[in-house]
């Protein structure tokens, strides 16, 4: 969970998100080294009184500054492509949930069950219980079993939305008339918060997403209770 004055990302709750965090550190290290080198060269050029009469025509320098950036780009691109393919892989999901964006709430339908679905609205500030988070709590959470592949089918009823949960490394656009899909595996139990990440109107800021990952037996008990109340 994020906390005040935090500078880094949220703790990863999915293997692919852990890969994304490692890639972020990898890319940031390369950017830092390049920035340091450029700053040093600029400082040296401004402060030195020496000149090089061959500075306008140096084949060796041109070869270096052509090949070296290409190598650096490859070092960034290869791990990025690997993670991109991992994010698109959806192999034999144990549970499929349809998330539909509306102005301004989410509705969820568990397609593996005959009659399990609900709308999820933000809890108003005056109704929050002690310890709950303002603008992030919902009246109904999307409950999923932990350590199980979950597929989320994302679409929208009216305008563009985006279903995003940072801790799970998921962000998928909800486009009216189109069905997009994303997948995740919650590696630990917990409550993971997200929000609509596409500006969708006046109350865009009030479309929170709450995913609760629980052990399988707890999920079965929850689904049984929901089906009884339906």
UniProtKB/Swiss-Prot annotation:
Among NCBIfam families, the record links this protein to: CoxB
According to UniProt, the name of this protein is: Cytochrome c oxidase subunit 2
Mitochondrial matrix-side segments: 46-59
Positions with a binding annotation for Cu cation A1: 161, 196, 200, 207
Cofactor note as given: Binds a dinuclear copper A center per subunit.
Q: Which domain of life is it from?
A: Eukaryota
Q: Name one Pfam family in it.
A: COX2
PANTHER family the UniProt entry points to: CYTOCHROME C OXIDASE SUBUNIT 2 (PTHR22888:SF9), CYTOCHROME C OXIDASE, SUBUNIT II (PTHR22888)
**Which organism was this protein described from?**
Cyprinus carpio
How does the annotation summarize its subunit structure?
A: Component of the cytochrome c oxidase (complex IV, CIV), a multisubunit enzyme composed of 14 subunits. The complex is composed of a catalytic core of 3 subunits MT-CO1, MT-CO2 and MT-CO3, encoded in the mitochondrial DNA, and 11 supernumerary subunits COX4I, COX5A, COX5B, COX6A, COX6B, COX6C, COX7A, COX7B, COX7C, COX8 and NDUFA4, which are encoded in the nuclear genome.
Identify the residues that bind Mg(2+): 198
Question: Which cofactor does the UniProt annotation name?
Answer: Cu cation
Q: Which UniProt keywords apply?
A: Copper, Electron transport, Magnesium, Membrane, Metal-binding, Mitochondrion, Mitochondrion inner membrane, Respiratory chain, Translocase, Transmembrane, Transmembrane helix, Transport
